[in-house]
Design a protein with these regions (language model features):
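Cytoplasmic/organellar membrane-interface segments at the starts of transmembrane helices
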Residues: 310-312, 364-410
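Alpha-helical transmembrane segments and their membrane-interface junctions
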Residues: 321-342, 400-410
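Predominantly late transmembrane helices and immediately cytosolic-facing juxtamembrane segments
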Residues: 175, 274-296, 350-387
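Short helix-boundary/re-entrant hairpin motifs in multi-pass inner-membrane proteins
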Residues: 29, 36-51, 71-77, 134, ...
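Interfacial segments of multi-pass membrane proteins
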Residues: 256-263, 335-353
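Structural signature of hydrophobic alpha-helical transmembrane segments
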Residues: 1-12, 51-65, 100-115, 155-167, ...
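Transmembrane helix-loop-helix hairpins at membrane boundaries of multipass inner-membrane proteins
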Residues: 1-89, 409
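Alpha-helical multi-pass transmembrane bundles of energy-transducing inner-membrane proteins
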Residues: 16-32, 77-176, 180, 188, ...
């Protein structure tokens, strides 16, 4: 019964999304049934919490995906574009839950399905560039590693899962699929991608953490420093709002990798911080998507002063950015509260200090700069402003509350 439920729950939104994708359903029906499916999944997870011996971290990761899916669908209005967005969110929800909840070959099948969906989504944009070819090669390698990892020896299995982990907890240069899918996604889909993408990466890293050697830890810390510097510089010069959020996410993800050797027991500090990061970045992306649906806004600085004519938007964005500014501190203090540090070598301490300063100071710079380009300043007089609807505001607040619970309480 337990194993069957682990497969059935992800199939509910996946099959609904696939059926609706190739049928002419009304947008209101898609949204209502999508919310109903999420309610059934939430009830199923609640039942599993008490009826079966399921690892608490797995339920926490699955619950994070369900909450993000709820928020991504809840704020949609009744239109054909919103219907397409809800369908994409349901497909992502089903595939992501299948990866988190299941084991061995079933997990690999869901992961290959998600990677295939990513490739199809990117290919639909018909961008035949060298970077696109690299992304497709990356996805192909991830599919091969996912399918073959079940049959590999223990050592090769660790490297295969590590490749998938650095893809979904993106480090430079493995971040290209993440940047492209966030850039190409419409509306709230980009927000949901951020949460589901990082959640899958956290689950993969949790699996292989005990198998990582000291040499791997050192290499990953060095790569994390390079990734943080590169992504922070990319965020500072980024005008496209979706790429700004994606680059900022990559910069902060570097902290997860960089502190792996500082604190033991990744499950106790890494997963809560990763989910907090996903909710905050997903919340900013969701807030931006609501403005983009109204005005087609994609470039930072084009619509300044939004906090004045759109007070709900202003409050939500200021709170999210304030939370984002303190993200590095959440991870450090949450780690120190539950365990001692284990780093003793001077070179490791130096790299970690550089990483922390780059992410914190760089993040403070580009987040405040973004805030001044959007919420503050003088609003344009030629734009018919309309503030966030109640459902949109609730969706953003739900992600904020989720981030607070994960970062402070859990």
């Amino acid at each position: 019964m337990n194993n069957a439920l682990l497969v059935i729950l992800p199939l509910i939104p996946l099959l609904l999304g696939l059926v609706w994708k190739y049928s002419n359903c009304q947008s209101m029906a898609v949204k209502s049934l999508g919310l109903g499916a999420i309610g059934v999944i939430a009830a199923g997870l609640f039942y599993m919490r008490f009826a079966f011996e399921v690892e608490s971290s797995i339920l926490f990761l699955a619950s994070a995906i369900v909450l993000a899916g709820l928020c991504a669908i809840l704020g949609q209005e009744n239109s054909q574009q919103s219907s397409d967005i809800c369908i994409s969110n349901l497909i992502i929800l089903g595939l992501s839950l299948g990866i988190i909840l299941n084991q061995a070959m079933i997990k690999s099948v869901f992961l290959c399905g998600l990677l295939g969906f990513i490739a199809i989504s990117i290919n639909s944009k018909h961008q035949n560039t060298f970077r696109t070819k690299l992304i497709f090669l990356h996805i192909l390698l991830a599919i091969i590693f996912s399918l073959s990892s079940v049959l590999m020896g223990e050592t090769l299995q660790v490297f295969a899962n590590l490749f998938i982990a650095v893809t979904f907890l993106p480090l430079v240069p493995f971040h290209l699929p993440f940047l492209r899918i966030i850039k190409d996604s419409k509306g709230s889909v980009s927000s949901f991608w951020i949460v589901s993408w990082l959640t899958i990466g956290l689950e993969k890293l949790n699996i292989i953490y005990a198998s990582l050697t000291s040499e791997m830890f050192f290499s990953l810390t060095l790569l994390a420093v390079v990734s943080a510097v590169f992504a922070s510089l990319a965020s500072l010069g980024q005008k496209c709002n979706s790429l700004f959020i994606a680059s900022a996410t990559v910069a902060h993800v570097a902290l997860v990798w960089g502190l792996l050797e500082v604190f033991p027991h990744f499950k106790s500090w890494g997963i809560p911080f990763g989910i907090t990061l996903a909710f905050v970045m997903g919340g900013i992306s969701l807030t931006f998507s609501f403005v983009q649906q109204r005005y087609g806004w994609k470039t930072l600085g084009i619509l300044p002063g939004l906090a004045s004519p759109m007070p709900r938007f202003g409050v939500a964005l200021v709170l999210l950015v304030t939370f984002a500014l303190f993200l590095p501190l959440f991870q450090t203090f949450s780690g120190l509260m539950v365990m001692p540090t284990i780093v003793t070598q001077d070179v490791e301490i130096l790299m970690i200090s550089i990483l922390f300063l780059v992410v914190w100071l760089g993040g403070s710079w580009y987040f405040i700069q973004m805030l001044h380009q959007t919420a503050f300043g003088e609003a344009r007089s030629d734009v018919p402003y309309s503030d966030l609807r109640l459902t949109e505001f609730i969706a953003i607040w739900a992600l904020l509350l989720g981030a607070s619970y994960s970062g402070v309480i859990y």
